[in-house]
From Swiss-Prot:
The modification ADP-ribosylglycine is found at residue 76. Keywords: ADP-ribosylation, Cytoplasm, Isopeptide bond, Membrane, Mitochondrion, Mitochondrion outer membrane, Nucleus, Phosphoprotein, Repeat, Ubl conjugation. The record marks 68 as: Essential for function. One of its GO terms (cellular component) is mitochondrial outer membrane. Ubiquitin is encoded by 4 different genes. Uba52 and Rps27a genes code for a single copy of ubiquitin fused to the ribosomal proteins eL40 and eS31, respectively. UBB and UBC genes code for a polyubiquitin precursor with exact head to tail repeats, the number of repeats differ between species and strains. PANTHER family: UBIQUITIN (PTHR10666). This is Polyubiquitin-C. The gene is Ubc. Belongs to the ubiquitin family. Residues 1-76, 77-152, 153-228, 229-304, 305-380, 381-456, 457-532, 533-608, 609-684 form the Ubiquitin-like domain.
Amino acid sequence: MQIFVKTLTGKTITLEVEPSDTIENVKAKIQDKEGIPPDQQRLIFAGKQLEDGRTLSDYNIQKESTLHLVLRLRGGMQIFVKTLTGKTITLEVEPSDTIENVKAKIQDKEGIPPDQQRLIFAGKQLEDGRTLSDYNIQKESTLHLVLRLRGGMQIFVKTLTGKTITLEVEPSDTIENVKAKIQDKEGIPPDQQRLIFAGKQLEDGRTLSDYNIQKESTLHLVLRLRGGMQIFVKTLTGKTITLEVEPSDTIENVKAKIQDKEGIPPDQQRLIFAGKQLEDGRTLSDYNIQKESTLHLVLRLRGGMQIFVKTLTGKTITLEVEPSDTIENVKAKIQDKEGIPPDQQRLIFAGKQLEDGRTLSDYNIQKESTLHLVLRLRGGMQIFVKTLTGKTITLEVEPSDTIENVKAKIQDKEGIPPDQQRLIFAGKQLEDGRTLSDYNIQKESTLHLVLRLRGGMQIFVKTLTGKTITLEVEPSDTIENVKAKIQDKEGIPPDQQRLIFAGKQLEDGRTLSDYNIQKESTLHLVLRLRGGMQIFVKTLTGKTITLEVEPSDTIENVKAKIQDKEGIPPDQQRLIFAGKQLEDGRTLSDYNIQKESTLHLVLRLRGGMQIFVKTLTGKTITLEVEPSDTIENVKAKIQDKEGIPPDQQRLIFAGKQLEDGRTLSDYNIQKESTLHLVLRLRGGMQIFVKTLTGKTITLDVEPSVTTKKVKQEDRRTFLTTVSKKSPPCACSWV
């Protein structure tokens, strides 16, 4: 029969061959015609490099087939192959050597059969038919050798037509290998195949075991749509890039095209469309990106930091990350350290489950933040979803699936976008970030699907402190949903919230539209009292205010109640109890304030000012303060600037040591005054005070204690007569 051989110059050679001819024979015929030595020839058919010892019929090469001839580059070089045991093998190779050739060289050196070798470079598994130069492997590059696990198994591939293909595979096969097997069976080119498992599109460079695909698993095959189109990518500098793409292109492909045009590495690119960050493994059509759509390109900030991940066993893992890392990236790092597959990981921060496509900076996760790792329970089960039309959908799920995952499965079955779905179970609307097990949804449970009315709107929630919270809601949201949104923003448990609108308390099971709450309406949030009690607040004018409070109320809450009664803004209030100024973030119970206790209200003087603090070393510190700041506050500011703990600080002004509970205005400290900072010596001691009656009192003091402080010790009643004007006592100091 006749076959054709096409060279890179475009020339076509015609050869007379037989199906039983080896590739070696064919190369000899080419040498006879063109004078090219066989060892400089590489023959390619259907995307594969042909091996010398195989025949044309082995490759299903038939009459009038066309082979492609590529010349091997001359240029010997050394590369290194590192094994998992740490051993490094040195190989003499050429850039034109195939991965298959390299494996043969490894077999010659180490005796490992090629079919048990997996070679990795730059994080990718290398394919037998490709060359070293295809992967940009240069002299002294290091490849990593991983041995294939022996464990052949069958998997199934289901097409959209309903046909099921059976494949013989190994857990270590790459998705690319699987696509090649599908091509062998069905003739579908790999670049037209998309493989889906557990709702995820599988990436070429990953292995079946990476996705936990086991024997008799079923993959779904979707053909890529052919249909080129233009899209635009806008950078933060305002530049617009035009790209030729297909709906079936992955986000990874798009980033590669941007790299080709602009030279920006894919790992520094974040693509945004319709306010969402796009995930590498998803396609443009997955995000409904159509011709002439505009994506926004944001560069990832380079700024490594450490975060901690705490497991339920109490173990803490340290990770090196960047603010721009996605949660998916973080899970991959945890897998590298701990061997836990990403799909079994749930990461929690500030009480929220983190979503794969979002970044650490999206969640305001900063250096030395701690995430909590919860393992997903393995245990597939069936649940039912009932629509308002009466139709029942059956879903295969796991207890650890999020509501978001469930909505995605409904979208796969019914085509309803997740943002139009509301799922109800036991009378409650289910939140995207929570799991089925969080709601105690078990096998054969029935969820109810309600379609969202299109009509998002903003409402405001005003607290007793005067703070206004803005919420994104829909008229169909229940009051329970609204309370959950408030909890997400403010951390207030729903059972401590009372919402008031138009003078009425709102009931959990009713919706905003039931109460005619429309866009930009304002609700009022009142906290439910836990264990109410009365306290009194006495002002400098002598007026006494009675307040209903709870031990768990913060000082901030108390100030808000005073504002409600007296109209005094919280930032002008100072509350004093037992001689101490009370801090906003602390609770009444923190200060042991009980029923019928009396607080004292002092108004803050308006007037920020600068003061100076001079240390014994001669250094001068400048502080921004108010006359109403306590000495304790000032010491805290010094700690912020200089790192000196407050209990080691003594502040002196006009020859007097300043007391923590007093304010700057109490000492007549005005703008640009200078305080002196003396460090307390660590070294407590006992002294004795002998009275004229012969009684001896023992006191625990420090060398830095003032006489005034000694007079105020627990025996202060006894010592009240000791003052500058009274006769001196016979005190012996030891």
